[in-house]
Amino acid sequence: MLKPGDVVALDGDLGAGKTVITRGITEGLGLISEDVCSPTFTIVNEYTEPADKVPVFHFDTYRLSGEDDFIAAGLDEYFYRGGVCVIEWSSVIAGLLPKKTVKITILGTGSERKITIDDPEGRLC
């Protein structure tokens, strides 16, 4: 089970299902998931309702040029805000990810996909 401070890194092509996985994570944590959408232009969306649940901070780093952009925008501070961080296109900031990050890679789109989960602490597997 995911807990405050956990980071989930999602990588896959456009349309692979990264946002769908994020929707499942928010729902699994008891948050309202209908409004989950890719934060391509906002960079980060916060899902915090209901307030008694662990919040999810959902990032899309596709448009960032690298780790320096992430830090300059103060986005690394979300790692310490007591929520679960879910990061689409996480390879853009790979050097900033905590060692215990759950990494999910999605290969393919459409009806056939290969999903690989690297979960160093066994939270999901």
What are these language model-derived features?
Residues 1-5:
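Phosphate-binding P-loop
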Residues 56-64:
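Switch II (G3) loop of P-loop NTPases
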Residues 14:
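The conserved Walker
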